[in-house]
Amino acid sequence: MADDAGLETSLCSEQFGSGEARGCRVAADGSLQWEVGGWRWWGLSRAFTVKPEGRDSGEVGAPGAPSPPLSGLQAVFLPQGFPDSVSPDYLPYQLWDSVQAFASGLSGSLATQAVLLGIGVGNAKATVSAATATWLVKDSTGMLGRIVFAWWKGSKLDCNAKQWRLFADILNDVAMFLEIMAPVYPICFTMTVSTSNLAKCIVSVAGGATRAALTVHQARRNNMADVSAKDSSQETLVNLVGLLVSLLMLPLVSGCPGFSLGCFFFLTALHIYANYRAVRALVMETLNEGRLRLVLKHYLQRGEVLNPTAANRMEPLWTGFWPAPSLSLGVPLHRLVSSVFELQQLVEGHQEPYLLCWDQSRNQVQVVLNQKAGPKTILRAATHGLMLGALQGDGPLPAELEELRNRVQAGPKKESWVIVKETHEVLDMLFPKFLKGLQDAGWKTEKHQLEVDEWRATWLLSPEKKVL
């Protein structure tokens, strides 16, 4: 009770991070007496005195802070200010990521042993020149693949970071399997290890790029460098442990291909499962096409906006690498119009800084963006395109859209531009409510992860309108 009274009449207080606060009261001799709490795992609750001349020599650390050994480990392996300085999904993701890194390290040891065996290590008939030539071909193939893949898919990795992260790790398992099987067919050894290294270089690009995107998501205090550095420290520790375990494992499997292959399949299964759990633990708070499609569908059917946690839990992870081209944002204007009449059809009836063309037969939407189009405009254009796609679906829709869908699905088909014009009017009423619902649910609408090309255009409005 005395402790409680001390807290009630405390002169000042302090706390470490998000830990429990402690109060300070004045003792009879004028010294400061700090209340120490938060040591729940020891069941301690006591007070200690700090004299004016010994302010920095307190007996016990800050309440709510870890004990000295745990504090040291946290300082080495976790970002400063953890857990407040990172996203809520940081810890579960990092734990599963460490498990997958450990399994991958052991699998990599088995693959490296197989490659060295195939090159000729331990074989008196093998020549240095042949081994060197094989190694050079393998490395050069991987370097070229790295450049080509970065050019081909580099701009798309941000949009589906979770899917590409999972894809990269599965491809890494395929690459290691090829390396393990390479010595079995010596005549194809060079081609097999070159293909494997090509896959590993793609993994390096996709994995590194998506890891950077996830670091941006996890860092909540502009501490991306700290989060990245501590992630590297965690990975190094896991790799070190994996190396020590490999030193014990390799002598056991050496000379027994069947047992080695069995270990590899077990580690691969663990690796894929841990990767799936790690990626599934992520809660991205920005909208890409997949998450926007889920949220919009739920909103049109039930009138509620899914929060980021629910939407990320429903987001498919095994698809999305090569999505159907149903929505294209930032297309060139010359692709959509070839006459003044066609331009007038797209422009009239609205003043939004984007033009939308809908191909009903292929359910494909192409959007031309104005020079002034910002994140909100792009989000509206994407919502508009996905809403048009919903007109050809079967789920329940709001009354305005249900009536429009009945007219669309009842032949003969209307001109697409007429439907687009009518949906502009519906969206004028629907989108402000939808946008507010997104913000209230916790989505970050000031930025997005939609795939947008770089084409921009300017145009005049229809005669009854003014210049945009």
Curated annotation (Swiss-Prot):
Transmembrane helix as UniProt keyword: yes
Modified residues (N-acetylalanine): A2
Any one Pfam family match given in the protein's UniProt record, by short name: UVB_sens_C
Modified sites of kind Phosphothreonine: T49
InterPro entries to which the protein is assigned, alphabetical: RUS_fam (IPR006968), UVB_sens_C (IPR055412), UVB_sens_RUS_dom (IPR054549)
Family to which the UniProt record says this protein belongs: Belongs to the RUS1 family.
Entry protein name: RUS family member 1
Organism: Pongo abelii
Gene name for this UniProt entry: Rusf1
